[in-house]
Design a protein with these regions (language model features):
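Short, low-complexity, intrinsically disordered N-terminal modules
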Residues: 2, 13-18, 28-30
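N-terminal compositionally biased or targeting/leader segments
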Residues: 9-12, 79
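A detector of single, family-specific signature residues
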Residues: 22-470
């Protein structure tokens, strides 16, 4: 039995050893679990000496080490390949495939749950393909950890022969599990909320691209029937994403719809348009629009074909805008349930759009051990170029990580440059680098790096305070 509860959490299967475990052995096992990879076969002489002094044979510790089951899962669409290893490279079961059906996933969960000793399961975060497997194993009460595929890709490349197959990848993930046993982070219910938020952000990005493309297409069409109509109004978009100039172009899609009917008739129709769409009617606006239309040159004639094309494009744009605004609201509502929401929203330059996007792409900050880990995750950290006497003083950003996160960071940097808040440290840093003549991408990337460091510190402190309060 183990005398200290804090040690029982660390030592795990050592509780099965009948003879009381002394402090030297606890220290020895702690050294093996934290300092040494679990797949190392031999026990160092220092540990053997500590065990002899404690009166425990080395076979006891070897038996304990065999009670660690590392499960590596290589996920693909519709099926996964599973490998189960123990320390020392012991193969519990050769890699096998499991299809993503309810029955097969439940059978897999039962099998993994029946393994003796401590079992940890690791899989890569592969888009959406891993979610059925993750859901089944998490609901079965098993220890599941989802890791960045980049970590697995660069792990264990110590062979001249490059093998790329599902069984080989599953074994590699299992070896990664053994080497990082103590540092693995268990998937939790809060991760489910973050997964939903990241999925919403992915859809938000998709529909935003559609909206931008639809708007560009509409403006290109209108330039041939009503040039410059998109610049006639400066009203901001509504909560549903609709814009006044778009609604106006639907009713008055051609310049002849304005100038051919006379000022009086156009004024009446414009007034009816404002009433229908709940816009404020301005007395002088119809005359300005009418006079401006006289000087415009329409390339396309006023025919039904062009009217159909323009109005269909407007419907498509309004639909995409509606999706974008709906997703924006859902993201903000979901992000507000996370503990760091108020802290993130309090950072200058972060609003109801960028805040949820940051939280979605960064995820749980507690999984990053230091600030540099977060900047490396975002790909805004400077690379290292040193060899022998050569030490480069200026290196390119790594750009490894979430491209959507880097895009959001650059948008925040743009907001800071536009608003120029003198009391904001990130803006002062940006302005300093810009004044030094640094290229655009250099000072924007450096500003994003500094912003993430501040983000990390504030959110980390927020989570720490919440833990202490509990």
């Amino acid at each position: 039995m183990i005398r200290h509860r804090s040690d029982s959490v660390l030592l795990g299967p050592l509780a099965s050893v009948r003879k009381p475990v002394s402090q030297p052995v606890i220290a020895a096992v702690r050294f093996m679990q934290v300092e040494l990879p679990l797949h190392v076969r031999l026990i160092p002489q220092e540990i053997e000496s500590a065990m002899r002094n404690a009166g425990i044979h080395a076979d006891s510790l070897l038996e304990v080490r065999r009670m660690y089951n590392a499960v590596g899962i290589d996920v693909s669409k519709g099926k996964s390949t599973i490998a189960v290893l123990q320390p020392g490279g012991t193969v519990i079961r050769k890699p096998f495939d499991v299809s993503h059906t309810s029955q097969n996933l439940n059978e897999l969960a039962d099998y993994l749950g029946s393994l003796e000793g401590s079992t940890k399961i690791v899989m890569e975060c592969t888009g959406r393909y891993h979610e059925p497997m993750l859901k089944a194993l998490y609901e079965a009460g098993l220890f599941v950890s989802v890791v960045n595929p980049h970590l697995i890709k660069n792990f264990g490349n110590n062979s001249l022969r490059k093998v790329k197959s599902d069984p080989a990848d599953a074994r590699r993930i299992a070896r990664y599990t053994l080497d990082n046993w103590a540092e693995l982070r268990q998937y939790s219910g809060m991760d489910n909320t973050r997964t939903q938020l990241k999925t919403l952000n992915s859809q938000f990005s998709f529909f935003m691209k559609q909206k931008v493309a639809a708007k560009a297409n509409l403006i290109a069409l209108l330039d041939n029937t009503y040039p410059g109509v998109n610049k006639l109004f400066d009203s901001p978009p509504r909560e549903d994403g609709s814009e006044k100039w778009v609604d106006y172009a639907y009713s008055f899609w051609h310049v002849d719809c304005v100038r051919r009917i006379g000022l009086k008739t156009f004024t009446e129709r414009y007034k009816a348009f404002c009433k229908k769409h709940h816009y404020i009617f301005q007395q002088d606006k119809p005359e300005k629009l009418f006079n401006a239309s006289k000087e415009l040159v329409a390339v396309f004639p006023k025919e039904k074909t062009y009217k159909l094309l323009i109005q269909q494009s407007i419907r498509q744009l309004n639909l995409a805008s509606e999706h974008v605004e709906r997703l924006r609201q859902e993201m903000n509502a979901l992000a507000s349930t996370l503990p760091e929401y108020s802290t993130v929203m309090g950072i200058y330059g972060v609003g109801k759009t960028y805040g949820p996007q940051l939280i979605a792409e960064i995820g749980d900050v507690s999984r990053f051990t230091h600030r540099e880990a977060l900047t490396a995750f975002a790909g805004v950290d400077p690379g290292v170029d040193e060899s022998g006497q050569h030490k480069s003083k200026s290196n390119r950003a790594s750009k490894v990580g979430s491209a959507r996160l880097r895009k959001t960071l650059f948008q925040i940097m743009t907001t800071l440059l536009q608003n120029a808040p003198e009391d904001d440290p990130v803006y002062r840093f940006l302005d300093k680098k810009r004044a030094q003549g640094k290229p655009y991408y250099v000072y924007m990337t450096a500003g994003a790096n500094k912003f993430l460091r501040i983000y990390y510190g504030k959110v980390k402190e927020c989570l720490r305070n919440l833990e202490q309060a509990e």
